[in-house]
A protein has these predicted regions:
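Contiguous, small/hydrophobic- and glycine-enriched helical/loop subdomains that border
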Residues: 109-150, 157
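Short, basic/glycine-rich phosphate-binding loops at helix/coil junctions
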Residues: 49-62, 112, 134, 212-223, ...
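Residue-level signal for inorganic ion chemistry
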Residues: 15, 43-45, 71, 105, ...
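Short beta-strand scaffold segments in enzyme catalytic cores
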Residues: 17, 41-45, 139-143, 149, ...
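Charged catalytic carboxylate motif
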Residues: 70, 108, 236
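Conserved, helical-rich catalytic subdomain that frames metal- and/or nucleotide-binding sites
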Residues: 145, 150-252, 267-270, 277-280, ...
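Glycine/serine-rich anion-binding loops at beta->alpha junctions
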Residues: 91-120, 137-138, 249-266
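ATP-binding N-lobe of GHMP and related small-molecule kinases
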Residues: 1-100, 118-123, 127, 164, ...
Length: 294
């Protein structure tokens, strides 16, 4: 009997996100500093002939039909490029909220590609993995090797991994899903200045940041251009941000991706834990997770 293979699917967090403009194909070019949390989903694979997917966990009810799941889409994209690909039974433990700005579906798809690579003796840098990732979804490529990077284009242009200081953080979602397409459609170019020198595209600046304090200082000069249109769609995001800004020890609070999850950065794990405890008492229906970003 084939033994199970297991991969974690860590949450993706956009520490910065600038929208550079809309392309002729309707998509938007962005630049974003992306890091990964130590919380996420868990995906296992029992190698076999048939491709199947079962989902359990707190977020299972929000994942939709199996045929629409990015795990299945990624597996099929790779099967179209690798002759006689060995697939099997995927089991997804869905811990992250869906449509939440954490790239959880993309992280799951990337984990599926890593599992299939292991099951079929494909090298981690096999170009067919990255082609399948690109065709599966905009964020899948950056999740394939989950390390800090600058992401550009629609997500397909990636920098080399960055050795950034790790950050103590709180992730908070108010229990609402915000459709990415609607958030982008609400973005107004006139309200967003062009990126300045030292922005998220300046790899030299990021490479020279030596410690957590200087990274936090640098991040304060950055933005998420999708925050305003997301708040216009779902005012609960503003409530989350206000609560995070008001937490003792919060250095920075910002929305991740297209929302609705927001993050707050703290100088210590103790401050993060205290903020989490207080917010859970005030807002028991919110999804709240203490984490380390890196």
């Amino acid at each position: 009997m084939a033994s199970d293979l297991v991969e974690s699917a860590p949450a993706k967090v956009n520490l910065t996100l600038r929208v550079l403009g809309q392309r002729a194909d309707g998509y938007h070019d962005i630049q974003s500093l992306v890091v990964f949390a130590d919380v996420g989903d868990r995906l296992s694979l029992t190698p076999g002939a048939d491709l199947t997917l079962s989902v359990a966990g707190p977020g299972a009810a929000q994942t939709g039909a199996e045929t629409d799941n990015l795990v299945v889409k990624a597996a099929r994209a790779l099967a179209a490029r690798v002759r006689q690909l060995r697939a099997g039974a995927f089991r997804l433990e869905k811990n992250l909220p869906v449509a939440a700005g954490l790239g959880s579906g993309s992280a799951d798809a990337a984990a599926a590609l890593r599992l299939l690579a292991r099951a079929n003796d494909l090298a981690p840098d096999d170009p067919r993995l990255y082609e399948a990732a690109r065709l599966t979804g905009a964020d899948v490529s950056v999740c394939l090797d989950p390390r800090p990077r600058v992401m550009r284009g629609i997500g397909e242009i990636l920098s080399a991994p960055l050795a950034l200081p790790r950050l103590s953080a709180l992730l908070v979602n108010p229990g609402v899903a915000v459709p990415t397409k609607l958030v982008f459609s609400g973005w107004k170019p006139s309200a967003n200045p062009a990126p300045v020198s030292g922005g998220a595209n300046d790899l030299a600046v990021l490479a020279r940041i030596p410690n957590e304090r200087q990274l936090l200082d640098w991040l304060m000069g950055e933005v998420n251009d999708l925050e305003a249109p997301a708040v216009a769609l779902e005012p609960a995001i503003a409530d989350v941000l206000a609560s995070l800004h008001g937490a003792a020890g919060c250095r920075l609070a910002r929305m991740s991706g297209s929302g609705a999850t927001c993050f707050a950065l703290f100088s210590s794990v103790a401050e993060t834990a205290t903020a989490a405890k207080n917010l859970r008492a005030q807002f028991p229906h919110w999804w709240i997770s203490e984490t380390t970003l890196g």
